[in-house]
Regions:
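Domain-level recognition of nuclease-like catalytic cores that cleave nucleotide substrates
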Residues: 195-211
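Active-site-adjacent loop/helix micro-motif of nuclease/hydrolase catalytic cores
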Residues: 125, 174-183, 198-199
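Conserved catalytic cores of phosphodiester-cleaving nucleases, focusing on short active-site segments
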Residues: 134, 138, 159-173
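Structural motif
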Residues: 170-174, 191-194
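Hydrophobic beta-strand segments of well-ordered beta-sheets in folded domains
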Residues: 165-168, 185-189
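Accessory nucleic acid-recognition modules appended to NTPase machines
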Residues: 4-155
């Protein structure tokens, strides 16, 4: 997953993580300040702390009170605003309930890192890595196509993801079945370690061509 998405592909792991950290700093200290010039040094510090908390936990269903405490943020509104800004910066992906949800005001159903590369700041769980890869590819597809207000992938009550508010996806390994989504129309399984899909079971790597 990392190699398929690398923008720099270094041979040296130390260089990889150093470059990764530099890109994160540029996104927060440069890009965000250009977009939101009213952000001050304390806000930037809190946003960095919030991202470090998220990196240690993703993907996860956020508890607002726990995130506020961990990132030393006083109120819900500020936390949701900082989360939305990290999403704007392309560092995290807020998975909302549906297209009517507003990232700056509503609680996200789940938080992902926007790119699987960021997961390599710690030892990633393979299941989390698969889901993050899937979210990354679909999210970039919708943004590049400028479809559905740049947001076409949502949390699903039955499967893992709900795309275009029509297609339900479960993401898993080669032996992942349809138990959770067997009675749902337009439902699919995206399977890792699968060379060629069959029927409604799609090889996960295929989604890499959407980027």
């Amino acid at each position: 997953y990392r190699i398929r998405n690398d923008p720099f592909l270094p041979d040296n792991e130390v260089l990889f993580f150093h470059t990764l950290q530099q890109n994160i700093n540029v996104s927060i200290e440069g890009d965000l300040l250009n977009i939101y010039p009213k952000l001050n040094g304390n806000s930037i510090k809190k946003i960095k702390l919030l991202l470090s908390v998220i990196i240690k936990s993703v993907p996860f269903e956020p508890k607002i009170s726990d995130l506020k405490k961990a990132a030393d943020i006083k109120d819900d509104r500020t936390l949701k605003d900082y989360l939305a800004k990290l999403d704007d910066a392309g560092l995290i992906k807020l998975l909302m309930q549906n297209s009517l949800s507003m990232k700056a005001f509503d609680k996200p159903e789940k938080i992902f890192l926007a790119n699987p590369n960021l997961m390599y700041t710690k030892e990633p769980n393979i299941g989390n890595l698969r889901e993050t890869f899937f979210v990354n590819q679909l999210d970039n597809y919708y943004k590049n196509k400028q479809l559905l207000n740049d947001d076409g992938i949502f949390a699903s009550k039955n499967g893992d993801f709900y795309c275009e508010e029509k297609y339900t996806f479960e993401v898993g390994g080669k032996n992942k079945g349809f138990e959770q989504i067997k009675d749902i129309p337009n439902s699919y399984v995206a399977s890792d370690d699968l060379e060629i899909g069959i029927g409604n079971k799609i090889a996960l790597w295929i989604f890499g061509f959407l980027y």
